A protein has these predicted regions:
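Charge-rich amphipathic alpha-helical interaction elements
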Residues: 1-125
C-alpha cells in the first residue's frame, strides 16, 4: 500500500501545479486583453485624428471657395463641388468607422475587466 502522507504530499503538489497553471493562463489572458485595449485605443485616436484632418480640409476648402476661388467660380464649380462631396463622403465614412472603433474599444475594455476578474479568482483560490 501507498504511504498516506506521501500520497497527500503528491496530491498537494499536483493541486499546486494546477493552481499555478490556472494563474499563468489567467495572467496570459489578461495581458492579451490589455494589449487589445491598447490597440483599440490607438485605433480610436488615429480615427479621431483623421476626422480632425478631414474637417480641417473641408474648412480650408470652404475658405478657399469664398476667397481664392470666388473670381473663377464659374469654371471651378464642378471641381469644387466634386472635391467638397468627396471630403464629405470621407468624413462620413470616417465618422462611422470611429463609431465602430469606439464600440470595439468598449468591448475590449469589457473583456479586459473580465480577464482581470478571472485573474483575481485564479490567484485567490
Amino acid at each position: 500500500m501507498t504511504d498516506p502522507v506521501a500520497r497527500q504530499l503528491h496530491d498537494a503538489r499536483q493541486l499546486q501545479r494546477l493552481r499555478d497553471l490556472r494563474e499563468r493562463k489567467a495572467l496570459a489572458a489578461l495581458h492579451l486583453a490589455e494589449g487589445e485595449v491598447a490597440a483599440a485605443e490607438q485605433a480610436v485616436a488615429e480615427r479621431q485624428r483623421a476626422m480632425e484632418r478631414l474637417q480641417r480640409e473641408r474648412d480650408q476648402l470652404s475658405q478657399r471657395i469664398v476667397t481664392d476661388c470666388a473670381p473663377a467660380m464659374g469654371r471651378l464649380s464642378a471641381y469644387v463641388s466634386a472635391t467638397q462631396e468627396d471630403l464629405d463622403d470621407q468624413l462620413e465614412r470616417t465618422e462611422y468607422a470611429l463609431i465602430d472603433d469606439e464600440d470595439a474599444l468598449s468591448a475590449a475594455r469589457e473583456k479586459a475587466a473580465e480577464a482581470r476578474a478571472a485573474r483575481l479568482r485564479a490567484v485567490s483560490h
